[in-house]
């Protein structure tokens, strides 16, 4: 399984497109999605609530957020994405195969 870790802060405008795209893999149980919020003041977490497996809240800092997400990840492959990074299903599955 792939664990996709997405550190965010105030990404309400970007997050839904990315998360909606990842739902096919999530439905196949090929990935888990971990959103790590670094203090958003917009509705980022509300938008993501039903589209991710975990929402964690922590202090701001990409490295801190990534490490917190990695600490609960269940996958044997970790993929770190930005909220506005779009990766195809084929690309993700090729990472899993390597």
Q: Model segments located where?
A:
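Catalytic metal- and UDP-sugar-binding loop of GT-A-like glycosyltransferases, i.e.
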Residues: 58, 81-83
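Cell-envelope/extracellular polymer assembly enzymes that use nucleotide-activated donors
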Residues: 1-3, 32
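Short aromatic/hydrophobic "clamp" motif used to bind/position activated sugar donors
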Residues: 78
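Conserved donor nucleotide-binding strand/loop of the catalytic core
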Residues: 31, 45-72
């Amino acid at each position: 399984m792939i664990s996709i870790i997405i550190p965010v802060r105030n990404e309400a405008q970007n997050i839904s497109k990315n998360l909606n795209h990842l739902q096919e893999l999530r439905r196949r149980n090929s990935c888990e999605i971990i959103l790590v919020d670094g203090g958003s003041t917009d509705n980022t977490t509300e938008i993501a609530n039903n589209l991710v497996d975990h929402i964690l809240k922590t202090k701001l800092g990409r490295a801190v957020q990534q490490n917190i997400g990695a600490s609960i990840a269940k996958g044997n492959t970790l993929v770190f994405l930005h909220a506005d990074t779009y990766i195809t299903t084929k690309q993700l599955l090729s990472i899993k195969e390597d």
